[in-house]
Amino acid sequence: MSRGLGDVYKRQSKDCPSFGGVYKLAAIQNKDGEFVPKIKISENIEKITNPGNKTIYRIYDKDTGKIRADLICFADETYDTSEDLLLFDPNSTWKKTRLEGGTYTMKEILKPIFIRGECKYTSPSVKEIASFCEQEKNTLWDETKRLFNPHKVYVDLSQRLYDTKTELLNNVNR
């Protein structure tokens, strides 16, 4: 019998039935260098992986500088902030928000550490990390920072990523 790390933790602790941050395969690079999306399915909808080679954009309100949402998309997707952007909850797709073009900004927040085995990242100093954390904390709405009943920062999927995920789920066991 083979076991994954999550299985061991699941059997060892009833208080903590899942173990986050475990590596999951998201894509396989084919002979042509293209990434073929793959998916891991779970009974728990939040644990179903998002397939493909991805990046993450943080979306800010242009006037306030506060975070509106994070958007997970394929690494080759680009966005024009002068155009409207439809965001939706990937688990409750009827929950939608339309951001009007020109009212938001976007910043890619995923930084490559290694590319083809070579380190491409210079680690910042502790002082720089503290400064960055303070700056990012200032982009959170007060409702998000409160300890009692805080609002959450929404993490949405691009339409293309959502469609790919849905297609892979629909093709399971076919």
Label each residue range with its predicted role.
Residues M1-Y9:
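Single conserved hydrophobic/aromatic residue that forms the stacking wall/gate
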